[in-house]
Amino acid sequence: MSRIEAVFFDCDGTLVDSEVICSRAYVTMFQEFGITLDPEEVFKRFKGVKLYEIIDIVSLEHGVTLAKTEAEHVYRAEVARLFDSELEAIEGAGALLSAITAPMCVVSNGPNNKMQHSMGKLNMLHYFPDKLFSGYDIQRWKPDPALMFHAAKAMNVNVENCILVDDSVAGAQSGIDAGMEVFYFCADPHNKPIVHPKVTTFTHLSQLPELWKARGWDITA
């Protein structure tokens, strides 16, 4: 690929340090329904997995049927509370975003209002004017590549000429299946390794400009 048309970012765990917060909110949600889970185990198992799928898995394992909309309300309220009090940016996110000269967007399995909340709190929204794309917009979520195609169409770019930066296996798979160059963020030692010709693994956002330059992509100032 000689020219990069756009850079796609995941949100949670890639730009905003929210994965542990979200795991704690899952634990709180299930506690409301009498199910006790270990926060670290939740973090390891469900990174990048959409909410209703997590509810289905845990419900099946515990032999219960949960009202998903009621459970979601508990979860969203707890996430909002924790975001307001504890949320921080991933180290290096601000510097990277300010250096990128190519068009950018965010592609997340989370709802748009969650992205608005987290990225607004961390002063990142101005990097992505009207460029927040959620699986909820099209009712299809990573690892399905549909979200990548949806975002590329809205951005008026060729998806195969775009980069995806994501910290989850599900996200990386969506990028692979869309034909993108995937930069797999593995700062978390719990991340499963991915070996694929379309995937480059890295451990800190500050590494990306040099990795891109090494590929001949001049997309940072």
Curated annotation (Swiss-Prot):
Its EC number is 3.1.3.-. Substrate binds at residues 10-12. Mg(2+) binds at residues 10, 12, 167. Keywords: Hydrolase, Magnesium, Manganese, Metal-binding. Its cofactor is Mg(2+); Mn(2+); Co(2+); Zn(2+). The active site is at 10 (nucleophile). Optimum pH is between 6 and 7.5. It is an enzyme of class 3 (hydrolase). Catalyzes strongly the dephosphorylation of 6-phosphogluconate (6P-Glu) and slightly the dephosphorylation of dihydroxyacetone phosphate (DHAP) and phosphoenolpyruvate (PEP). Also hydrolyzes both purines (GMP and IMP) and pyrimidines as secondary substrates. Belongs to the HAD-like hydrolase superfamily. CbbY/CbbZ/Gph/YieH family. This is 6-phosphogluconate phosphatase. The lineage of its organism: Bacteria, Pseudomonadati, Pseudomonadota, Gammaproteobacteria, Enterobacterales.
